[in-house]
Amino acid sequence: MSRLKKLYTEEIRKSLQEKFGYGNTMQIPVLRKIVISMGLAEAAKDKNLFQAHLEELSMISGQKPLVTKARNSIAGFKLREGQGIGAKVTLRGQRMYDFMDRFCNIVSPRIRDFRGFSMKGDGRGCYSLGLDDQQIFPEIDLDRVKRTQGMNITWVTTAQTDVECTTLLELMGLRFKKAQ
């Protein structure tokens, strides 16, 4: 069992139940999955660059990314149907908790001028953020990076509100900006 999973089962569940007064233990929010995605439309023109970004995403997540493909052809964007335009990875279980632990303790402190993430969620218990650079991850070899590439990370929880979601993620180690 990972350190974060153990922390969740032993401490975080109890503190969430006390704070929000859940009558049933099944109401306590749980982290369901983490989705990491990259939009690689510019890199789609260069196959070597596209492959390099897929390898980077694979190193960051620990599993093979799924290539997302264009549904329609759009002549204005020089896009063809079925062309690879992005990549995503869905983390669940042990890998999810390991990534969350690494992200909170190693990656987020490496972000330049980091003062915490925004507390805005989607209103349904999910939280998303965008990163401008993949080089903050320790798995990435800086000498092999040809082009900086951003990514989106989404935490999907069973929380019903943004407050419950951000409280869960904050107790797990994600740092948020304090409200003024």
Swiss-Prot record:
Could you list this entry's UniProt keywords, alphabetically sorted: Ribonucleoprotein, Ribosomal protein, RNA-binding, rRNA-binding, tRNA-binding
MF terms from GO for this chain are:
rRNA binding; structural constituent of ribosome; tRNA binding
State the SUPFAM superfamilies in the record.
Answer: RL5-like
Ranges annotated as spanning the membrane:
none
Q: Name one GO biological process term.
A: translation
Keyword Cell cycle annotated: no
**Keyword match Cytoplasm:** no
Superkingdom is Bacteria
InterPro entries on file = Ribosomal_uL5 (IPR002132), Ribosomal_uL5_bac-type (IPR020930), Ribosomal_uL5_C (IPR031309), Ribosomal_uL5_CS (IPR020929), Ribosomal_uL5_dom_sf (IPR022803), Ribosomal_uL5_N (IPR031310)
A GO cellular component annotated for this chain's UniProt record is: ribonucleoprotein complex
Q: How does it assemble?
A: Part of the 50S ribosomal subunit; part of the 5S rRNA/L5/L18/L25 subcomplex. Contacts the 5S rRNA and the P site tRNA. Forms a bridge to the 30S subunit in the 70S ribosome.
User: According to its UniProt entry, what is the function of this protein?
Assistant: This is one of the proteins that bind and probably mediate the attachment of the 5S RNA into the large ribosomal subunit, where it forms part of the central protuberance. In the 70S ribosome it contacts protein S13 of the 30S subunit (bridge B1b), connecting the 2 subunits; this bridge is implicated in subunit movement. Contacts the P site tRNA; the 5S rRNA and some of its associated proteins might help stabilize positioning of ribosome-bound tRNAs.
| Family from the record | Belongs to the universal ribosomal protein uL5 family.
- Protein name from the UniProt record: Large ribosomal subunit protein uL5
Q: Which organism is the protein's source?
A: Chlamydia caviae (strain ATCC VR-813 / DSM 19441 / 03DC25 / GPIC) (Chlamydophila caviae)
This protein's gene is called: rplE
